Amino acid sequence: MNLTTQISNELKQLSGFSSSTPRHIEMTDSDGLVLGVAVVAVDALSCAFESLTLHVPSLVGNESGALQAWADALSGRVTYLLENIGPIEIDQRSNQVLIRSTPPDRTSTGTQFYEVLLSAQTNGTFLLRRYRAESGQPGRKSVDIHLTHETLHKLVSDLVDTIPQPATE
């Protein structure tokens, strides 16, 4: 069963769930991709979650070029969040790419932004979180991401569809 179908089934089972402590759900597809979502609320149309991870075993040990290709493909395709996203930093030593909202959402009280970390270390990971930085306060706080079920399905599909394919020899 693909990840989109699995997440749909999980959301149906969690309908009505709401908690300050996230419920971690995890799904695996036939290609070994592992999707994890830290859910804090689900209703009939939408959900809120702290983070979304996708472990991609085929990316383990890949050079930053594959991650850069994934970052570019994601940034071009995922245009339906509150802000557009784009790669802002490539760390070739640690094989990581940082993607953020471009530009972030700025208000008089602070700034909110999405942050995605792509990593080819240990288990090849995509990690999505949203942060808020208060004006005049140091640091940032993680805030929940709110999406309709349909938007979450599209995001999961786009993540899977843009994974770089290993080079064939």
Where are the language model's segments positioned?
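Short, structured motif recognition centered on aromatic/hydrophobic residues
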Residues: 34-40, 113-122, 126-128, 155-156
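Conserved short hydrophobic interaction patches
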Residues: 73, 77-84, 154, 158-162
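Charge-rich, low-complexity N-terminal segments
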Residues: 1-80
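Short, hydrophobic/proline-enriched secondary-structure or compact coil segments at domain edges
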Residues: 93-106
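Short, surface-exposed beta-strand/loop "edge" segments at domain boundaries and coil↔beta transitions
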Residues: 33-34, 46-48, 61-62, 103-113, ...
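Mixed-charge, glycine-accented linear interaction segment located at domain edges/termini
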Residues: 126-169
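Phosphate/adenylate-binding glycine loop and adjacent helical scaffold
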Residues: 68, 86-93
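Long, charge-dense low-complexity segments
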Residues: 1-5, 107-114, 121
